[in-house]
Amino acid sequence: MMKKKSWFTLMITGVISLFFSVSAFAGNVFWEPLSYFNSSTWQKADGYSNGQMFNCTWRANNVNFTNDGKLKLSLTSPANNKFDCGEYRSTNNYGYGLYEVSMKPAKNTGIVSSFFTYTGPSHGTQWDEIDIEFLGKDTTKVQFNYYTNGVGGHEKIINLGFDASTSFHTYAFDWQPGYIKWYVDGVLKHTATTNIPSTPGKIMMNLWNGTGVDSWLGSYNGANPLYAEYDWVKYTSN
């Protein structure tokens, strides 16, 4: 009886220890498979447009989940020369740390598929942003960029050596007080060290078509529906 009691006590102690280890780890890591709408963690943008170069209206109906467990953002047209697009963003703000995503961008001229952090005047802060963007006109490349108090101009185009629109790959940036490092499938591709942003922001993913920025995105030809897919997101704090 004593042997059974000792074994049971040991087992319970082990389970409790494992629970607290996982809890402590979870305090530093946010990881989520994007297989369903978790309203406690995420929001769907709905019913408004960013204006300026964004030629679409964010719609909750353009944020969906596939049967095989992927987030699917869509660009659609409800009427002639009217477009709806999809954006998914975290409810919480996140600061310095490693941000990772497994995604497959849409391919078409005049569009952008993205993964980024953002905060700005609408959130009561300065405009700070860190970007991973795919310009649909050439998905064999990825663009990295960032803004600090609204100052950007740090675009860096990287040749991937593959077409990102055909399969899922992992893209990441490590944001620290003195630098930002961007990675593709775990390989360092670019480092920035000047005027690094500091304000925590929301984790965001979106798909949209542009207007008035043909020199950057190419001219959007009205093709729809178009889709960008996301498998999972992970954030590891300092």
From Swiss-Prot:
Q: Which InterPro entries match?
A: Beta-glucanase/XTH, Beta_glucanase, ConA-like_dom_sf, GH16, GH16_AS
Cystine pairs annotated here are 56-85
User: This protein's superkingdom?
Assistant: Bacteria
Q: Where is coiled-coil annotated?
A: none
Please indicate if the UniProt record lists Signal as a keyword: yes
Active site: residue positions: 129, 133
Question: Where do the GH16 domain residues begin and end?
Answer: 29-238
**NCBIfam families on file:** BGlucanaseBglS
Q: What else is known?
A: Beta-glucanases of Bacillus have a substrate range similar to lichenase of germinating barley.
One family name in Pfam for this protein? Glyco_hydro_16
Which EC numbers characterise this protein's activity in its record?
3.2.1.73
Q: Could you identify this protein by its name?
A: Beta-glucanase
Molecular function as annotated in GO: licheninase activity
* UniProt keyword terms in alphabetical order: Disulfide bond, Glycosidase, Hydrolase, Signal
Which SUPFAM superfamilies does its entry note? Concanavalin A-like lectins/glucanases
Please list the GO biological process terms of this entry: carbohydrate metabolic process
Q: Which residues form the signal peptide?
A: 1-26
**Record field: catalytic activity:** Hydrolysis of (1->4)-beta-D-glucosidic linkages in beta-D-glucans containing (1->3)- and (1->4)-bonds
Q: Does the keyword Transport apply?
A: no
Similarity comment: Belongs to the glycosyl hydrolase 16 family.
